[in-house]
Amino acid sequence: MGQVLSICSSKSKEKKVVNEKPTVKPKPAVNVQKPAKAITKASSPPRTGRKLAETGNTSNKEHLSPTEAARVAAEKRNIEKKKGNGKLGRQLEKERAKPMKEHLQDISTQRQQEREQIKWD
């Protein structure tokens, strides 16, 4: 048998030595500034913050818990709702005050009256 040629036969057998030293990039120059002298102002007393509830818009000067505030707001809404102005406002309040059972009975009586009004020839 003859010589066996390999695929890698065309490559040289010498290994190339590569310098694998990491290149160090020069660091940019950092400008260090000295802090400027602090300007002293006339000292004023420290201000205290205020809560939004203390703006004077509330009817109660005392602080209310969230549940109490919700109750007060619901009472105000209820009073305003009851101020039904005019005939239509009163009718609306009557309808709203009806329980569901009465409301369903009214609807059923209206439907019965409509059926009775239909005349068959």
Swiss-Prot record:
Q: How does the record describe the protein's post-translational processing? A: Myristoylated. The N-myristoylated protein is further palmitoylated.
Residues annotated as coiled-coil are: none
What are the boundaries of the region Disordered?
1-121
The answer to whether UniProt assigns keyword Manganese to this entry is no
Q: Where is there biased composition of kind Basic and acidic residues?
A: 11-23, 73-83, 90-105, 112-121
Look up the record and give one Gene Ontology term from the biological process aspect: ERAD pathway
Q: Does the keyword Lipoprotein apply?
A: yes
What the entry lists under Pfam families is as follows:
SVIP
Annotated protein name in UniProt: Uncharacterized protein new13
Covalent lipidation (S-palmitoyl cysteine) residues? 8
Q: Which UniProt keywords apply?
A: Cytoplasm, Lipoprotein, Myristate, Palmitate
Location comes to: Cytoplasm, Cytosol
Q: Which family does it belong to?
A: To yeast YGL108C.
* Cellular component aspect of the GO annotation: cytosol
Question: Where is lipid attached as N-myristoyl glycine?
Answer: 2
Q: Which domain of life is it from?
A: Eukaryota
